[in-house]
Amino acid sequence: MLFFFIYAWCHLSHTILQPSTKIQMIVRSKPESNGEKKLMNHDEPNDQYNQRNYPSEVYADLVSHFMNFAYGKVHESGLQKKGVRCVDVSISGCQFWNGIPLSASWCTSLVT
């Protein structure tokens, strides 16, 4: 019962409290500065999309207080322009920052 309550709270907080902040990041396959944080893909090993399009790990510039939430999945949004692909970095799971359940999706620029 407690597990169900926690799951329900995480699900509702994801829907209600999802921040609207959009952060522009350049996603690369290798780090180019000390300020870049590794993003790990937590997808299933048989996820064809990630195996086909992205390396197992990517790096990105992130705002400092979001550093603890830098582990998530990379999904292509379908928007492409002038050699730059727009992708969403989705932070999955029920994670807390200052006591607030936090889940976010940001638009990033993938240099192709």
UniProtKB/Swiss-Prot annotation:
GO cellular component: fungal-type vacuole
Domain of life: Eukaryota
Note: Present with 149 molecules/cell in log phase SD medium.
Name of the featured protein: Uncharacterized protein YHR173C
